[in-house]
Curated annotation (Swiss-Prot):
Gene Ontology MF terms in the entry: structural constituent of ribosome
Pfam families, sorted: Ribosomal_L18 (PF17135)
Entry's family note: Belongs to the eukaryotic ribosomal protein eL18 family.
Superkingdom of this protein's organism: Archaea
Keywords of the record: Ribonucleoprotein, Ribosomal protein
Source organism (scientific name): Thermoplasma volcanium (strain ATCC 51530 / DSM 4299 / JCM 9571 / NBRC 15438 / GSS1)
Protein name: Large ribosomal subunit protein eL18
HAMAP family: Ribosomal_eL18
Length: 122
């Protein structure tokens, strides 16, 4: 079954979805296909996760992916790697201060193509 993205106008997001689908196919990793399908849905269905929630449920060294935005409410004390579509300005500043790594979803998928030990937060 192919995933076609016809309703998205944001070229960067379309490329992100296509990249996730390609990585999923090459490595038989269902997690990246799931992320692509979530992003292909309407924007109203995207997740918006605050830093305090990531800090509450993550452990040091975890890889967290968010099919949506990471917002800057709360603080983060754990050293985690976060992949998301968008990071708010406040979240970016707090992540830099705390020493966390943050990147796009396709970069996380390229770094971990099998998707092992990756947690999805919604």
């Amino acid at each position: 079954m192919s995933l076609t993205v016809t309703t998205k106008e944001n070229e960067a997001l379309v490329n992100e979805i296509r990249s996730l689908v390609e990585i999923s196919r090459q490595n038989s990793a269902k997690i990246w296909r799931d992320m692509a399908e979530r992003l292909a849905n309407g924007r109203r269905r995207y997740a918006s996760i605050n830093l305090y929630k990531i800090d509450k449920f993550a452990k040091d060294g975890d890889v967290i992916v968010v099919p949506g935005s990471v917002l800057g409410v709360g603080k983060i004390t754990k050293k985690v790697t976060i992949g998301a579509v968008h990071f708010s300005r406040a979240a970016t500043e707090k992540l830099v201060r705390s020493g966390c790594a943050f990147m796009s979803l396709s970069d996380v998928a390229k770094a971990n193509p099998k998707g092992t030990n990756v947690k999805i937060m919604r």
